[in-house]
Amino acid sequence: MSQLLEPSAETIKAERLYREMGLTDDEFALAEKIVGRPLNFTETGLFSVMWSEHCSYKNSKVLLKKFPTDGENVLQGPGEGAGIIDIKDEQAVVFKIESHNHPSAIEPYQGAATGVGGILRDVFSMGARPVALLNSLRFGELESKKVKYLFEEVVAGIAGYGNCVGVPTVGGEVQFDPCYESNPLVNAMCVGLIDHKDIQKGQAKGVGNTVMYVGASTGRDGIHGATFASEELSEDSDAKRPAVQVGDPFMEKLLLEACLEVVQSDALIGIQDMGAAGLVSSSAEMASKAGSGIEMNLDLVPQREAGMTPYEMMLSESQERMLLVVEKGREHEIKATFERWNLHAVEVGVVTDDRRLRLTHKGEIVADVPVDALAEDAPVYHKPSKVPAYFDAFQQQAPYIPEITEANETLLKLLAQPTIASKEWVYEQYDYMVQTNTVVEPGSDAAVIRIRGTNKALAMTTDCNSRYLYVDPEMGGKIAIAEAARNLVCSGAKPLGVTDCLNYGNPEKPEIFWQLEKSTDGLSEACRELGTPVIGGNVSLYNERSGGAVYPTPVIGMVGLVEDVAHITTQSFKNAGDLIYVIGETKAEFGGSELQKMLVGELSGKAPEIDLAVEKSRQQQLLSAIKQGLVQSAHDVAEGGLAVSLAEKMMECPFGAEVSLSLSAAELFAESQSRFIVTVKPSDQQRFENTVLDAVVVGAVTESRKLTIRNENGNAVIDLCQDELVKAWKGAIPCLLKSKA
């Protein structure tokens, strides 16, 4: 074995150095048992990253099995770089969401930027051209210097990378709550398009075929990044800044174009991104999936730092790198393409038939372990689960019913809450028009991207109200799926499938594991009912510090198909005189609501209820009406209730609304589920009402640029001009950022 100046196998075991790498005593013993001998330093490192939660899902795998992953249009489910769904005409959509939470907490610009880079590579490693980026962000209250710094730097990192690489950032969401103060969540999603014939797999097939390393050189950045992402943040986390990767979007652009060129060649057998766990995960996973092995000579790996050890080379998470398997004898074809793009393309190994990962360095074997042991044999845990005391208390509480005496003031204050307020400050930093396919820009219910050369378009969104999930994880899980689907339907799209990013605290705490368990129950039930299979995703646990865990935050990335661009619908009012309809009933449901947080400062009670059969029926009826051309505008009712949703429909158009509702002032802000606000031409009234059975006409669009909401007695409960609404909504975030902490 290696003569390098590293701890011996005896020292690793005696001093339990494996613990510093993230392995438990039992896990280290199991790894040694599988290999059949003591592990050296490099081998211990390989197991530590591959058996981390980030790579192995050892604490969540038992729950992920609940998700429906099959469907008539699913071409690739979980297990590859990204999932794929057929959209007919020999085309498919490829999409995936991933987290970069821990890196963004200590180095927000690079943490966010490399999160974008990694998710792009996941998509183009499948052979797809990325056409859109989205993100879902969570921060503490926008008051302290620290939170403002994290917010500004994360947004700048996303913009800096996405804008340079030439992929539009078209949508997302931002939520602000105290639980994210020290634990920001940064989830990045990418959507790509592909022809069926170009679909690639990350597999190392064909004994004797060549393993090639392409892209940027390997440095010491990101070593143990996967392990770092699998532990709680602490006061010592800043010392792990080297575990944060550094991105180069211009290198990524070259790599993207070169990879999309080589996928056209049948000399390419397999391709995978070197993401979490770098060269270890890409080589072990590609070999394991193909039932093969890989032998690599680490002397051949391009290095940008002197004296790198095998341990460092294998665990580095340097960005903009891919691992390819190429047909033996045709390496020159692949090299020629990468050289034309001024990129490394180096032969570093060969595919073997012994199902082992064998690494050599300076003429010595420095690691020799079974690939399946690394990629498949991590222990799987079903952690103890315990109902949190707060949940039992919430279930016993009388419903929270606020008293609203001044509805105008309440609406303006709600519009200025950072979670509801306009995110224009965020998305104006993104180039959302690059590639010139963006039809519906950020700010509506979902972004829409046209598919060139066809009459079709893709709608996409990210959604999760984590407050509902804290109050009731199972109900909140159902709502997260339903709201994402509602946003797509409001845009004229049929929901196709889901990619999820499950962000939670420490699963070793029974109350946290219970949250994970119950929310996955809700998510899976809703996916089955609404016909949206989960085709991939990511789990990010240990999102907590001494102050406590984040709310359960399973971010839902959902993509839908607009079958005809004529069906594209947006939220803004279109014509004066159009009838305003509310679909769905309003109940006095305020548990976990924006109003409760604003008035009380904390959450309690029961989450809004949802009937998935009713949800499905309303979505189908509304989509049918949209396809018939009966709907002028559509918007789902979410945070802040009907009053906020009506105001949002006025923000970007020269119209107002006159509405009458038989609701109390408080109920105007209730967050009951399965509701929509749509507008319809008077001439289409009968056909619309025959199609959408739950729709009730409540008023009309006016030219007055005022929002007037009357009660059943005809008295104006809300009466505000557009300028007041826009000022509160658009000015909130810039104003908070300028204020002194």
Curated annotation (Swiss-Prot):
Transmembrane segments: none annotated. GO terms for biological process: 'de novo' IMP biosynthetic process. CDD domains: PurL_repeat1, PurL_repeat2. GO terms for molecular function: ATP binding; magnesium ion binding; phosphoribosylformylglycinamidine synthase activity. ATP binds at Y57, K96, D500, G537. Pfam families: AIRS (PF00586), AIRS_C (PF02769), FGAR-AT_linker (PF18072). It comes from the Bacteria. It catalyses: N(2)-formyl-N(1)-(5-phospho-beta-D-ribosyl)glycinamide + L-glutamine + ATP + H2O = 2-formamido-N(1)-(5-O-phospho-beta-D-ribosyl)acetamidine + L-glutamate + ADP + phosphate + H(+). InterPro entries: PRibForGlyAmidine_synth_PurL, PurL_linker, PurM-like_C_dom, PurM-like_C_sf, PurM-like_N, PurM-like_N_sf. GO terms for cellular component: cytoplasm. The keyword Nucleotide-binding applies. Keywords: ATP-binding, Cytoplasm, Ligase, Magnesium, Metal-binding, Nucleotide-binding, Purine biosynthesis. Its main location: cytoplasm. Substrate binds at S99, H100, N101, H102, R121, Q245, E317, S318, Q319, S540. The active site is at H54, H100. It is found in: Cytoplasm. Pathway: Purine metabolism; IMP biosynthesis via de novo pathway; 5-amino-1-(5-phospho-D-ribosyl)imidazole from N(2)-formyl-N(1)-(5-phospho-D-ribosyl)glycinamide: step 1/2. Disulfide bonds: none annotated. Mg(2+) 2 binds at D122, D273. Its EC number is 6.3.5.3. Monomer. Part of the FGAM synthase complex composed of 1 PurL, 1 PurQ and 2 PurS subunits. HAMAP family: PurL_2. Belongs to the FGAMS family. Part of the phosphoribosylformylglycinamidine synthase complex involved in the purines biosynthetic pathway. Catalyzes the ATP-dependent conversion of formylglycinamide ribonucleotide (FGAR) and glutamine to yield formylglycinamidine ribonucleotide (FGAM) and glutamate. The FGAM synthase complex is composed of three subunits. PurQ produces an ammonia molecule by converting glutamine to glutamate. PurL transfers the ammonia molecule to FGAR to form FGAM in an ATP-dependent manner. This is Phosphoribosylformylglycinamidine synthase subunit PurL.
